[in-house]
């Protein structure tokens, strides 16, 4: 799995953890091991510009996903996963820090960025949260992936509660 993390934000973030949790999420979703993903970490000004340009919404947001080949997880266990370019995930540590502090289970900026990386991966794979049933599916899957990764890493304490709506 080729995953690049490029921090352009000027904020120190745990790039290795973002890489690790993205890799874990893609493996858990059975994405082809030769697929490619890019994660870019930007400051609030850059994120605001992307948010306005692509969503026509003011202000910075926490995470944006830009799919390329529209890869989807295999439907059956014996299906061969497709290979390709997943796309780009853009994260904003300034928004992540605020959300981590405001979350029901307060957590660090890095923990929020890990959660957002999984959220971005799921969006690249076609998951959404516009409708209540879609939201339940996506957020349930997101929690299972984050919990599984945290358990594998031996991390204790409550998992970050979703702050993405």
From Swiss-Prot:
Q: What is its EC number?
A: 3.1.-.-
Essential cofactor(s): Zn(2+)
For this UniProt record, the keywords arranged alphabetically read as follows: Cytoplasm, Endonuclease, Hydrolase, Metal-binding, Nuclease, Ribosome biogenesis, rRNA processing, Zinc
- Tell me which residues bind Zn(2+): 119, 123, 129
Query: Origin, by domain of life?
Result: Bacteria
InterPro entries noted in UniProt: MetalPrtase_cat_dom_sf_prd, YbeY, YbeY_CS
Q: How is the cofactor bound?
A: Binds 1 zinc ion.
What task does this protein carry out?
Single strand-specific metallo-endoribonuclease involved in late-stage 70S ribosome quality control and in maturation of the 3' terminus of the 16S rRNA.
Name-wise, this protein is Endoribonuclease YbeY
